[in-house]
Swiss-Prot record:
Xref: PROSITE patterns: CITRATE_SYNTHASE (PS00480)
PANTHER family per UniProt: CITRATE SYNTHASE, CITRATE SYNTHASE, MITOCHONDRIAL
Record: active site: 297, 351, 406
Record keywords, A-Z: Mitochondrion, Transferase, Transit peptide, Tricarboxylic acid cycle
Assembly mode: Homodimer.
Domain of life: Eukaryota
Name of this chain's protein: Probable citrate synthase, mitochondrial
UniProt catalytic activity: oxaloacetate + acetyl-CoA + H2O = citrate + CoA + H(+)
């Protein structure tokens, strides 16, 4: 109760104490919302009866794949260009978003600004947002998460710890406190959702870093204290225990490109669905993390690494020199055909929507080339990249023979010594909160209702279609 009372006080006061950079963010959001409000009104008035898609029986039994049933503002997946963050491609984001001094990768806080407002922030706005996030770091809230994580069984998965940590932070929710106190309404829900989102973005890096130390050393604590002089990704890297500037750049890239991926994937849709019940952003994001923890969603890069390690063992056993490009290409071609002919798939290749090389893969590959990676794992993944599309086209059983983001992300982390594969999904979640929380705030800003689709039964379908066909 004490935490709830404190949250009520902070929640009501927090909106009055907004910094100038937060005022700028809100101003941009309100301006765009006003424009969208007119568009939405016109769309519903003039075209509300138009069909977006046909929901076939195959589709409802097939995980609703291909059914257009959601409006999600932060990003859109283009089958030709890949993910677009507020209309910008990955390459455009890399070129246009503010960077750290001397760096080439976008700052994740700049990406968050873009996802939240729809506008590219200035250097000053990106720095101001970083300062705002540092201001919101609350030792008391982080200590609550630390205590909750420390109470878990030793064999608890890092994603279990992350979800529990976020739920512990929830006791400081300004959205929940204001709602309980009767201080919020439909017109102000979005502001409290934004407050919670900023607080969460400020506090989850420390929670994630403590989980890493728990995984590597058995202690739920930071490897190094937070440093308010550093940007969001660099400070996270420091709390993990990595001091190398090149690794900081790696984290800026990794956390930026994984920030969002449209609204229909499990973690984004779960977060959106739970938040539609006016559950606060902490509850919603924790639910999204639980979806992300599923092996069909967040574990793909680990599957790729298992595949690469198995290839590495075969290459070694066959006496192939990974630095002999021709010999390596010949060996990997042989192994790949054996894999495909046995009925298995190549992890990291193919995509449900995209029909070209995933731009997120490309930017990671370019990072490795720019920093002159020479380790065996990169040699493997790079050679596979050169030969795989041709093999898969010849095999003829895939619509997209090109690599996706998961084909490379684990290789980056392995190179810098972050080898704990069970932890990788925590990094994914830390990044993905930027997109899904922006989506939650915009749902509240646009006044979206409780999500409640209609369900049917097999018996009902059988009576309607099978009985009439007999």
């Amino acid at each position: 109760m004490r935490a709830l009372r404190c949250s009520i006080i902070r929640g009501v006061a927090g909106l009055r104490m907004a910094s100038s950079v937060l005022d700028e963010m809100k101003e941009q959001m309100l301006r765009r919302s006003k424009e969208d409000h007119k568009k939405i009104g016109d769309l519903r008035k003039k075209h509300g009866h138009e069909k977006l898609c046909d929901a076939t029986i195959d589709a409802v039994y097939g995980g609703m794949r291909g059914i257009t049933g959601l409006v999600y503002e932060p990003s859109l997946l283009d089958s030709a260009e890949g993910i677009r963050f507020r209309g910008l491609t990955i390459l455009e984001c890399q070129e246009m978003l503010p960077k750290a001094p001397g760096g080439k990768e976008p700052l994740p806080e700049a990406m968050f600004w873009l996802l939240m407002t729809g506008e590219v922030p200035t250097e000053e706005q990106a720095r101001g947002l970083n300062a705002e996030l540092h201001r919101r770091v609350d030792p008391e809230a982080i200590a609550a998460a630390q205590k909750a994580i420390a109470a878990l069984p030793k064999n608890a998965h890092p994603m279990t710890a992350f979800s529990v940590g976020v739920l512990a932070l929830q006791t400081y929710s300004k959205f929940a406190a204001a709602y309980a106190a009767g201080k919020s309404n439909k017109k102000t829900y979005w502001e409290y959702a934004l407050e919670d989102s900023l607080d969460m973005l400020a506090r989850t890096p420390a929670v994630a870093a403590m989980i890493y130390n728990r995984e590597t050393k058995g202690q739920v604590e930071l490897a190094a204290p937070s440093n308010s002089d550093l940007d969001w990704a660099a400070n996270f890297a420091k709390m993990l225990g990595f001091q190398d500037e090149e690794f900081r750049e790696c984290m800026r890239l990794y956390l930026s490109v994984h920030a969002d991926h449209e609204g229909g994937n499990v973690s984004a849709h779960t977060t959106t669905l739970v938040a539609s019940a006016l559950s606060d952003p902490y509850l919603a994001f924790s639910a999204g993390l639980n979806g992300l923890a599923g092996p069909l969603h967040g574990l793909a890069n680990q599957e790729v690494l298992k595949y690469l390690f198995s290839m590495q063992e075969r290459v070694k056993a066959d006496g192939v020199n990974v630095h002999d490009e021709a010999a390596l290409e010949k060996a990997l071609t042989k192994y790949t055909w054996e894999l495909l002919n046995s009925g298995q798939v190549v992890p990291g290749y193919g995509h449900a929507v995209l029909r070209k090389v995933d731009p997120r893969y490309t930017c990671q590959r370019n990072f490795c080339l720019r920093h002159n990676f020479q380790d065996d794992l990169f040699k493997l993944v790079n050679t596979i990249y050169m030969i795989m599309p041709g093999i898969l086209k010849e095999h003829g059983k895939t619509k997209n023979p090109y690599p996706n983001v998961d084909a490379h992300s684990g290789v980056l982390l392995q190179h810098y010594g972050l080898t704990e594969q069970n932890y990788y999904t925590v990094l994914f979640g830390l990044s993905r909160q930027m997109g899904v929380l922006a989506g939650v705030v915009w749902d509240r800003l646009q006044g979206r209702p409780l999500e409640r689709p209609k369900s049917i039964t097999t018996e009902m379908l059988a009576k309607k279609y099978l009985c009439n066909s007999l």
